Each structure stands twice: as structure tokens, then as C-alpha cells.
Amino acid sequence: MIVAAGTKNPNKIKAVKDAYRLFGFPAEVVPVGRPAGTPPQPVGLEEVVKGAVARAKAALEAVPGAEHGVGVEAGAVHAGGAHLDITVAAIADRGGAVTLGFGPAFQIPTAFLPDVLKGVELGELAERYFKKPSVGYREGIIGVLTGRRVTRYQLNLAAVAMALVPRLPKNAKLYRT
């Protein structure tokens, strides 16, 4: 199965490949860059979901032989009086169906919050503060905050795995529309 991933980030590409493998789908993942017009740091759940869906659909269109397009997007959401960074995955197929999955969310450091809410990428802020270049392509800010006990790859993997749940053959009847 050919899967187009709307990213060039090795973390996200590995998460897509491993999530498909987890459920027994042998996937050849073809990376495609982020579509134009997608903000680097979406704010609000609708914007994060919209970004993941846009990535998935654009990736699917960019790779003619792909069965699925996958978009993974992280962004800031407000819930329970806190601002959280959440990862959302969207999987689009040639029939027009889109399935969604969310990964674990963590509270955004208050020191970074004003800039994040203005649209500055959380990874960029972490790189500057922690003096770690390309942190988003490695462990992510969550990896820095947790001493690598939890990494960005794990958040991405969880989100893609959850987006695959409705696509599992054993669940076909449950999710039929």
C-alpha cells in the first residue's frame, strides 16, 4: 500500500509508517511537503484539525498511486483553563472519506504561550530557549520537557494509530456511513 504523508519531517514519516505496520498494513510512505497556506502553528482545535486534513488531502493528490494521504498537525488548544499542545492526524482516501485521530496533549509552557498564541511555532521557541537546533525533527519540545521519556514521535504515532482505527477491517461495520 502506498501512503502519501503530508510532511518532510522524519519524526512524522516514521510515525506514519510504524502506525500502519502496527495494524498489519505494509505501507510504503511517500513524503510530500506541507501544502501552501497551512499555518506553521495553528491555534484552536478547528485550525489544528483543518491543518491535518489539508495535509492529508494535498498529499493524496500529490501522489497518484497512493491509497491514503496522511496529515499530522500539532497546535495549541484551550481546554479546562489551560493551553495545550495537541497532535491531530487525518487520513484521507480516494473515496473522499477522512478519519481523524488525536494524540496525547500536554500543557504549553507559560513562558512560550504569548508567542504561540501569535502563531510562532512551539518548536522554534523551544529551539531558541533550550539551544537545541531542529528539536521538532528530533524529540520535540515534549522530549526536552520530559528528558526524552516521552517524544514527539510517540505523540505522532498515537495520533496516526487512532486515525487508523475506523479503517481496520474488523471495524468496517461499526464505521460504515
Curated annotation (Swiss-Prot):
EC numbers on record: 3.6.1.73
Keywords annotated in UniProt: Hydrolase, Magnesium, Manganese, Metal-binding, Nucleotide metabolism, Nucleotide-binding
A Pfam family hit: NTPase_I-T
Reactions accelerated catalytically: XTP + H2O = XDP + phosphate + H(+); ITP + H2O = IDP + phosphate + H(+)
Any one Gene Ontology molecular-function term assigned to this protein's record: nucleotide binding
GO BP annotation list: nucleotide metabolic process; thiamine metabolic process
Cofactor comment: Binds 1 divalent metal cation per subunit; can use either Mg(2+) or Mn(2+).
Oligomer status and interactors: Homodimer.
Family label: Belongs to the YjjX NTPase family.
Protein's UniProt name: Probable inosine/xanthosine triphosphatase
Species of the source: Pyrobaculum arsenaticum (strain DSM 13514 / JCM 11321 / PZ6)
